Amino acid sequence: VSAALTVQWASLTHSGSRKARNDDSFIAFASSPKGAETLPAHGSRSLENDDLVFAVSDGMGGGNAGDLASSLLLTRMAEIIPETFKTAAAGFFPDRLEYLRKAIQSVHEQINQAANNDETRGMSATLALTWFTPENLYLANVGDSRIYLSRAGKLSQLSVDHTAAWSSWKRGAIGEIEYRNHPRRSALYEVIGGGHAQVCPHFAAVPFVPGDSLLICSDGLIDGLWERHIADAMASGRPVWEIVEILAKRAIDNSGIDDTTLIVVRVA
């Protein structure tokens, strides 16, 4: 049996210049039969005994509703994901993507139920979640928080932005400049909460190899960065905390209006 791989990570969140409150939330936790263990802002951990989960959520809504939606979403995911170990111990091995689908739908309904007064009405959140197991990386996303993979110097977006403008860009109907200036670039047709009965996340299962790096981020980071900037920083081979600082500084210097949150993860 080959030695278990180690995951290194670093994270950062920065409040945008537009408002006092940061509506972004992020979480890093180790998932095991004992439950979820919250991880520090940066560190490294073996996949031998734990699954590792990293997620970013951008909350939307008036007052403190956005902050509430994003933090409620991630808190619940940290409660639900470790339950897979209990079902496995009982002899049932859940399909992790199906499990994630049910978990996200359940939190979607919970956020809708919590949006029952003037303060919280219409509150919603995006999600970009990566779940590392010893065999595979499972990911889920809703909205326009993103997950990128950098492998052998090549950057690919694993998540899907749930906007019509992004779809037009990806199928080549418009270029990156037109996309970035599109008036409806942030008009999301999928969110968690927001009053709709169902949510339809994007899911994927991706094998990972040593040397892979992942970026999980809110749209605030993307506002100030071209894709080539992300590709260059992710392929630089620098320590993960340094990549986080380089990307965040560049994004905030170039834009900085929206909240900016990112996690960089490297498999070693």
Please report, for each region that a protein language model flagged, where it lies by residue.
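PP2C/PPM-type serine/threonine phosphatase catalytic domain
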Residues: V1-A268
